[in-house]
Every structure is written in C-alpha cells, then in structure tokens.
C-alpha cells in the first residue's frame, strides 16, 4: 500500500511540474486581441506582449512619465493616421509570439552590454516573411530626441511590408542622453551586421535589403547608405539594395549648431553625428 501511495505522490508531483512548465505557453495562447480602445497598461500586461519583449515605452521620456500614459488608449498614444495599422501590428506581434517566434533580438553581445549598459536598449524586432527570395527590410523610426517611433511608423510600416511577404526588422536605437559618439548610426550599422551574420537563421538573403527610415531614422539610413567613411563600408556589409526615406533630415548642417548647443554643452564633444557630416 505504501508503495502504491508513493507512486501516486510521484505522479502528482510530475504532473504539477509539467503544468508549471506549460503556464507561459498557456498564458501566451490566451492573449487578448487589441483594439484602438486597449490601454497601454492592458497591452503591456498581455502575456504574449510580455513574452515578445517588444518595446512599448515610446513617449514616456517626454516628461509625462508612466503614470500619465498607462491608462491612455492606443488611440490616444499613437499617431492618428497610424493607429489602425499599429494596433494590427501589435496583434501580429502577439500572434507571432504565440506561434513560437522569437520577436526580440539583442544587437550587441552580453559582454558589450556589460561594458556599456546603454547598449542594452538596442534591439531588433522581427516579423518573419513568406517570400521565397528572402528579401528583408529594416525599418528605422524617428525619435524626436525624447520619444521613439517603435509603436508608430516603425511597427505600422513593418506590418504592412510583412503583409507583402517581406521579412521585416524594426530597429530600436539609442536616443536622448545615450547617443554619444554617434551612437544611433553605430546602432544601425551593427544591426545590419547582426542580420547579415544571422541571415541563414532568419531565412533572409544578406544582399539587396531595403532600409526604410523616417525623420531622424531617415537621416541615419541616408548616411549609412552612402559611400562615405561612416557608411555601410565601415561595417563590412553589402550596400542596401533600396533606400526609402520619409521626411528625413537631408542636411543636418542647418540645425547642427542649435542641436549642439542644446544637447552637447556638458559633454564637450559631438554627440549625434560626426563634426564633418
């Protein structure tokens, strides 16, 4: 009798352990669909979004903070013309996560992040494609110095391109005070390096990729696509096959003195760009 009870106890413990292991999968599979009226807190609390690692704090650095934004709806948080596309994209992020896709990838190595913690925020968010040729696009949103476009043009455009069958990556790069030594352009270069080095894993071809940039992201894509010393050649990667820039800063020279006076005085060095760009 004792032997039988022991076997029952062991069986119960094993079942309990299996149940615990399956909880994250079960939780992600029971993720809710998002709408324009979903709040930021509801989005961030969703199991699939949590598991995905997708960055959703795109306006909190503007001074209003988490408490102000967390109960705002996606309609209030996102740009009016992009709300529907961005909401659909977040539903796609959740769906991909439920299907076992690793959405978030760190661009810099753990050793590099340990040496410079600001590098930890540099991430790629992946939307796997279906096209047989494996062409991919890298979307680089704007940032307005204190807020990023990851939940606006970044994800909205990525989802639309993904609908067309392309593999798409959205780049989250350093902004505000973490952009010394021309950090954002370095982040873009390293992101392309990362995709190139992991092309087989992502099922993409390393050549003939497209860069799609908006605002400051458009400026970065333009600089990277050039043959200058700060362009793609500096990172030993193929030249972009296509360059699409939306409302970019084409010539930074006009606003460089103002930017330098506002952002750089305490650092005693150029921050967002090289002095000869």
Please tell me what each predicted stretch does.
Residues 58, 64-132:
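N-terminal cap/lid segment of alpha/beta-hydrolase-fold proteins
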Residues 269-277:
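Serine-hydrolase catalytic core
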Residues 18-25:
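C-terminal segment of classical bacterial N-terminal signal peptides
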Residues 136, 162-169:
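A fold-wide structural signal in alpha/beta-hydrolase
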Residues 134-142:
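Short beta-strand element of the alpha/beta-hydrolase
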Residues 190-261:
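Primarily recognizes the serine-hydrolase "nucleophile elbow" in alpha/beta-hydrolase
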Residues 149-156, 171-206:
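Catalytic nucleophile-loop/oxyanion-hole region of alpha/beta-hydrolase
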Residues 143, 172-176, 249:
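Short beta-to-alpha linker loops that shape the active-site pocket of alpha/beta-hydrolase fold enzymes
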């Amino acid at each position: 009798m004792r032997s039988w009870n022991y076997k029952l106890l062991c069986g119960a413990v094993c079942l309990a352990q299996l149940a615990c292991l399956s909880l994250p999968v079960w939780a992600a599979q029971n993720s809710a669909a998002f709408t324009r009226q979903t709040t930021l807190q509801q989005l961030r609390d969703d199991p699939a979004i949590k598991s995905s690692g997708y960055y959703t704090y795109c306006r909190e650095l503007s001074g209003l903070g988490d408490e102000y934004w967390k109960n705002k709806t996606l309609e209030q948080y996102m740009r009016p013309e992009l709300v529907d596309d961005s909401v659909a994209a977040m539903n796609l992020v959740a769906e991909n996560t439920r299907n076992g896709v690793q959405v978030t990838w760190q661009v810099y190595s753990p050793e590099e992040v340990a040496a410079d913690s600001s590098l930890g925020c540099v991430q790629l968010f992946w939307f796997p494609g279906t096209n047989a040729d494996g062409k991919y696009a890298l979307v680089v949103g704007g940032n307005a110095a204190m807020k990023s476009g990851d939940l606006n043009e970044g994800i909205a455009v990525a989802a639309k391109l993904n609908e067309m069958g392309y593999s798409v990556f959205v780049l989250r790069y350093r902004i505000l005070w973490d952009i010394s030594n021309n950090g954002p352009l370095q982040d873009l270069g390293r992101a392309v390096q990362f995709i190139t080095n992991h092309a087989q894993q992502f099922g993409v071809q390393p050549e003939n990729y497209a860069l799609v940039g908006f605002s400051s992201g458009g400026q970065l894509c333009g600089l990277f696509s050039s043959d200058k010393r700060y362009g793609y050649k500096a990172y030993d990667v193929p030249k972009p096959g296509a360059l699409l820039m939306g409302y970019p800063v084409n010539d930074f020279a006009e606003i460089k003195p103002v930017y330098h006076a506002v952002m750089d005085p305490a650092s005693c060095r150029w921050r967002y760009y090289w002095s000869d760009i």
